[in-house]
């Protein structure tokens, strides 16, 4: 059996409903619904969720670990939320959050406007910092990757958009 799939999920104040193959996780920050694969059995035991493969196949075993991780992320998201921090490095690189849009000045001849998907918010504590928050880990990571993709850090000076915890290894310039 999957090692990840064996461990129970503590609900930490989240409310879980399971109905015809769909699990709904509700918490103080919002609600996430997720389809549960029929190869995985979900049992709700007062305050914890246990997942087990429905049969002994390799696919069911693998899916039990995957579903456990997805549901655990949903529980964490609706109780505490997820956030990704980005830093802009470079002269004139700026970010400004305006409602559900993120305006970026990244050295192009035009400003880059990124539309935030539903359930994801962007904040700019300073002009060179972006904090992306939401309850869905996948969406938060996807938006952060899209924003970073507009101007990834270049290897010689390190200019660009990078994750706050990212270490950019700089190359040495060509010697004569």
UniProtKB/Swiss-Prot annotation:
Going by the UniProt record, its keywords in alphabetical order are: Ribonucleoprotein, Ribosomal protein, RNA-binding, rRNA-binding
GO cellular component labels: cytosolic large ribosomal subunit
Spell out the Gene3D superfamilies in the cross-references.
Answer: Ribosomal protein L6, alpha-beta domain (3.90.930.12)
Gene Ontology biological-process entries: cytoplasmic translation
Q: Is Ribosomal protein among the key words of this record?
A: yes
Q: Which InterPro entries match?
A: Ribosomal_uL6-like, Ribosomal_uL6-like_a/b-dom_sf, Ribosomal_uL6_a/b-dom, Ribosomal_uL6_bac-type, Ribosomal_uL6_CS
Determine if Ribonucleoprotein is one of this entry's keywords: yes
Q: Which Pfam families match?
A: Ribosomal_L6
An annotated Gene Ontology molecular function: structural constituent of ribosome
Q: How does it assemble?
A: Part of the 50S ribosomal subunit.
Q: What does this protein do?
A: This protein binds to the 23S rRNA, and is important in its secondary structure. It is located near the subunit interface in the base of the L7/L12 stalk, and near the tRNA binding site of the peptidyltransferase center.
Q: Which family does it belong to?
A: Belongs to the universal ribosomal protein uL6 family.
| PANTHER family xrefs | 60S/50S RIBOSOMAL PROTEIN L6/L9, LARGE RIBOSOMAL SUBUNIT PROTEIN UL6M
Name of the protein described by the UniProt record:
Large ribosomal subunit protein uL6
Q: Which organism is it from?
A: Burkholderia multivorans (strain ATCC 17616 / 249)
Q: Quick one: which gene encodes this? A: rplF
